[in-house]
């Protein structure tokens, strides 16, 4: 089964609450429930809460969503992890990341991975000063200090 992810992160301007408050709030709204296990980095994995399927919509003609592990080492089910907070924003992308565009002129960056190590660069289309976070990722990648 492919590992699909939905990553949520607070806006860059938002003050980051302590992780404990994030965990409590996610549980209070019914997105999560008890901790299932910890991964090799010691980060908790939370089981889907009672309102998980009301808060997150899975599209398709007949999506199959497993909410419980079938065995102790199972990771092929829907669960929630919290990463961070990190001192500096981290860039997140995946194998299905679409090429971003310049927010000024809409120039398309097909070879965006080559730019990932640069702090800033000038747009090939209009010359605007850009960075990875300022590109229009169309919700397929982005940066953050806290990831859910």
Pin down the residues of each PLM region.
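Aromatic-enriched hydrophobic runs in primary sequence
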Residues: 51-52, 63-65, 100, 121, ...
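Cys/His-rich short segments
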Residues: 79-139
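Generic detector of ordered, mature protein regions
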Residues: 35, 39, 136-139, 143
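N-terminal alpha-helical interaction blocks
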Residues: 1-92
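Short glycine-rich, basic-tinged beta-strand/loop micro-motifs
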Residues: 2-10, 139-148
């Amino acid at each position: 089964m492919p590992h699909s992810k939905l990553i949520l992160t607070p806006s860059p301007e938002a003050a980051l609450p302590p992780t404990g408050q994030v965990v409590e709030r996610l549980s209070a709204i019914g997105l999560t429930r008890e901790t299932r296990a910890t991964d090799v980095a010691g980060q908790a994995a939370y089981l889907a809460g009672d309102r998980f399927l009301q808060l997150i919509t899975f599209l398709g003609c007949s999506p199959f969503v497993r909410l419980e592990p079938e065995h102790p080492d199972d990771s092929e089910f829907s669960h929630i992890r919290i990463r961070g907070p990190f001192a500096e924003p981290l860039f997140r992308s995946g194998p299905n990341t679409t090429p971003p565009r310049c927010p000024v002129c809409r120039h398309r960056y097909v070879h965006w991975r080559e730019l990932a190590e640069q702090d800033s660069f000038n747009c090939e289309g209009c010359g605007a000063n850009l960075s990875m976070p300022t590109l229009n990722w169309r919700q397929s990648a982005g940066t953050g200090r806290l990831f859910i």
